[in-house]
């Protein structure tokens, strides 16, 4: 294969990856914990954007349970974002596994 052609394809893939990253950063991924008592929203960069608590879960006598529910909801929302990013990345790269971890 022609080296210049390969470099051109790589440059094209870089552009598509940048576009995909920008699009993903605009998406929101939500997850529930405790049967919907805690909701966490993260963006496509896996940054926490919102925590929503049902009033019934706020019990001063059981803060540990609330903390656990928040951790579960955030982790699940981040997993959804990571899974979506992986799917989009597979589309951009044509299924080629990249030998490095992307910073998002």
Curated annotation (Swiss-Prot):
The record's Pfam families line, in alphabetical order, gives: YbaB_DNA_bd
Decide whether keyword Nucleotide-binding is in the record.
Answer: no
Matches recorded under SUPFAM superfamilies: YbaB-like (SSF82607)
What molecular function terms (GO) are annotated for this protein? DNA binding
Q: Would you tell me the Gene Ontology cellular component terms?
A: bacterial nucleoid; cytosol
Describe the subunit structure.
Answer: Homodimer.
Q: What does this protein do?
A: Binds to DNA and alters its conformation. May be involved in regulation of gene expression, nucleoid organization and DNA protection.
Q: Which HAMAP family match?
A: DNA_YbaB_EbfC
Q: Which family does it belong to?
A: Belongs to the YbaB/EbfC family.
Name the UniProt record assigns to this protein: Nucleoid-associated protein GAU_1113
Look up and give the organism this protein is from.
Gemmatimonas aurantiaca (strain DSM 14586 / JCM 11422 / NBRC 100505 / T-27)
